[in-house]
Amino acid sequence: MRAELKRCSEARLAVNATALAALIVLMFPGNAPAQGKWVKLAPFPEPAFEIAGATVNGKIYVFGGLPSGGQTTPPGLVYEYDPGANQWTKKKPMPLPAHHIAAAEYRGKVYLFGGGIQKQAGESNWFPSDHAWEYDPAADSWKALAPMPTKRGAAVAAEVGGKIYVIGGAGLHPGAKEAALSPSQPHRSLGANEAYDPATNTWQTRSPMPTARNHAAIGAVNGKIYVLGGRVASPFIGGDASNTDVVEEYDPATGSWGALRARMLTARSGVGFGTYGGRIYLVGGEFQNRAMAGVFRDLEAYDPAANQWITLPSVPLARQGVGSAVIGNRFHVISGRLQSGGVGPGQAANYDSHDAFEITDK
């Protein structure tokens, strides 16, 4: 009898331990195991940050950004990456060089929106723009599109159902005289949500995002759009700006925003992001507060179906303002800046590193 009681007790303990382990995973999804590894690929030829990336027909295209060394003129870079050859090729530059651009692919072309521009040499490079462009990789050609209703930079874009939604960003207050954004110039984060229709070259204003922000991440999964993290108040890290961990869901079919989703494990802005297998992957980013400033190595993925986050192996080199894109099961993280915020003349804080996370658990 005592032996049977002992066996029953041990069985109950085993069951309880299993249940407890499952409960811990549910309560702390960031601790759930995940598979994958980082691989090193051909470095980016001209290190830059605040660049935009997109995938078209199995190749990556990187646009815009800011150079190293405290230079203020955006170079308007365009590069194509061929994963088969592990090689970068320079393409026709942007007609109007910009940084902090929102980009999305649709039917073999890349659509780019807004960003910060420089009107004259020596001036600020942070005039918010309403320009929209179509880049055709097959022809290596550019076409100007109908301008956005709202001038802004540091917005994000995603395509659902043949329309491209440009959401958030930073810009001037309504009615303000045209000026460059700066910490001393009154400006604001935006919840603007504007849908571009490539078929008709027209815009439609949609329901604004509840949490106005800039420098966020975005992903489209199962017909819905998710905006993750970013920066509230100012687009300039530090000062009045602060990172947010808020995740919001937009349904283009109903034109409405849903209830708040599971918050990010790490509040951050200026991240790289990409979507694969029903998950949205976020890497890197930056933060500042009164005590310190820095950049992140963290790689985390959000699963909208489960409304859960998972933690994955960190990128080898911490950085922010990267270009990012997905080809097959590889999440590419390209160039970026090694520190938070700006640098002085002659200081090179951008890096040419090109890493890809090989996803093996989806």
Region locations from a protein language model:
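Generic short amphipathic/hydrophobic targeting helices enriched at N-termini
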Residues: 11, 20-23, 311
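Residue-level detector of alpha-helix boundary/anchor positions
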Residues: 7, 21-22, 215
